[in-house]
Amino acid sequence: MRFFKQTSTNLNQLLYGIDPRGSKRGRDAYLYYRSTTQSGHHKRTWVHTFFRILQYNKFLYMPSKASGHDTYGHHTVSSKGSTHKFKRALHSINMNNMRIFLYAFWYIRDPRSYRLSGISFSTDGGIQTLPVTRRFHLMRLYLAADFKEFFTLDLRWVNSIRYIENIQKIRSFTLVSYVPNILNGRPLFARARGSACLVRYRNKLQHLGLIWVKLPSGKYRRVSNGNSVLLGKIAPKLRSELGNTRAGYWVNRGIKPQVRGIVKNPVDHPNGGRARSIARHRSPWGWFTK
């Protein structure tokens, strides 16, 4: 993948070139979410793949007069008889006085991503990110694993050869990311990042319409001819940003580093020596006594 430079001047410039029916120019829009964890003076930022945008719709949202603040100090927005709460830290705009242009995206969801059915962006006061459902109801954005930690969303352009195709049209020994079920739309084979399924065998009897797919675990599963698959691998994590760390810590994607010897310095090694250097004793006039 090749990542283009992100421009936050105007959302219309970011969305320029996206075909509502799908990308025909070989350039697709992917969305990434960024989660940050901090322990002491160490700050780690994870950037993950979120989904691929298929189409988008633009509409104007005007907060009603019933909007205000509740007893907990949250922003409340009334829409179609339902009240949705927002944290003050998530939004830098006053939703009671400003018009908000929202962009609702329909996308191909990553199986390991959080179960959202759309993302909307506001063009007033910079690019603000608000998740929406299929009925365009605003909701609060939080991490499913940790309800105390919030994350932001970024829109970037990428060059990718990944696209959706019917499994009946692709050849054998083709890597696919996941096989969605045509009945309920859920993926049958949710793969870890960086891995893929392998289309292995095809049944010669066309009336059966069965194809065997090899999973990364080595097992084979039988799928139907009517399923559509996402070609290519699931994109791995882009990068992990971490500041100055000590030797011996697991910071590189969970791989334990090999530290040879013990450095007598507590900054470079957790088993280090003194907090300050050992200097020779000096007299009040600055001369060494020994």
From Swiss-Prot:
SUPFAM superfamilies, per database record: Translation proteins SH3-like domain
Keyword terms, alphabetized: Hydrogenosome, Ribonucleoprotein, Ribosomal protein
Entry keyword Ribosomal protein: yes
Gene3D superfamilies: Ribosomal protein L2, domain 3
A single cellular component GO annotation: hydrogenosome
SMART domains registered for this protein in UniProt: Ribosomal_L2_C
Domain of life the protein comes from: Eukaryota
One GO MF term attached to the UniProt entry: structural constituent of ribosome
PROSITE patterns to which the protein is assigned, alphabetical: RIBOSOMAL_L2
Subunit structure: Probably part of the large ribosomal subunit.
The family this protein is said to belong to: Belongs to the universal ribosomal protein uL2 family.
Identification of the protein by name: Large ribosomal subunit protein uL2m
Organism name: Nyctotherus ovalis
Origin organism lineage: Eukaryota, Sar, Alveolata, Ciliophora, Intramacronucleata
Gene behind the chain: rpl2
